[in-house]
């Protein structure tokens, strides 16, 4: 079982939280939208409403205590980039960040991401492989 910090609880982040819960991991879920946080409370170990671009807020989460930090913010690349950078500065062991385009991935990797995922590309490939 791993301890995972998940930031961003939109469609992608919500499904990550549910899958991590199914796998038995401890998940701390964070979003700025109260309804998203409340909807996932039954499925995560803990959840907080907060701004992940705020260094003091991130410090309060105890970043070094997590095995993996996932940045699943999809609608605001600037926030994703700032969050990724702050996580690494605060001692995150591993940061996995979401990107939609190659240029975003380059910025994320240069600013602290250990890995970048492309949800839309990954799903498109998975779907295409299932076509006869």
Predicted regions and their residues:
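Cytosolic regulatory regions of ion transport systems
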Residues: 1-132
């Amino acid at each position: 079982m791993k301890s995972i910090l998940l930031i961003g609880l939109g469609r992608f982040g919500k499904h990550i939280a549910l899958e991590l819960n199914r796998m038995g991991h401890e998940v701390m879920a964070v979003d700025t939208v109260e309804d998203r946080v409340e909807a996932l409370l039954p499925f995560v170990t803990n959840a907080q409403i907060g701004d992940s671009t705020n260094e003091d807020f991130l410090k309060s989460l105890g970043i070094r205590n997590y095995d993996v930090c996932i940045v699943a913010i999809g609608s605001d690349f600037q926030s994703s980039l700032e969050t990724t950078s702050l996580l690494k500065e605060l001692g995150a062991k591993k940061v996995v960040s979401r990107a939609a385009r190659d240029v975003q991935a380059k910025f994320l990797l240069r600013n602290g991401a250990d890995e970048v995922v492309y949800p839309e590309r990954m799903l498109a490939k998975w779907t295409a492989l299932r076509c006869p």
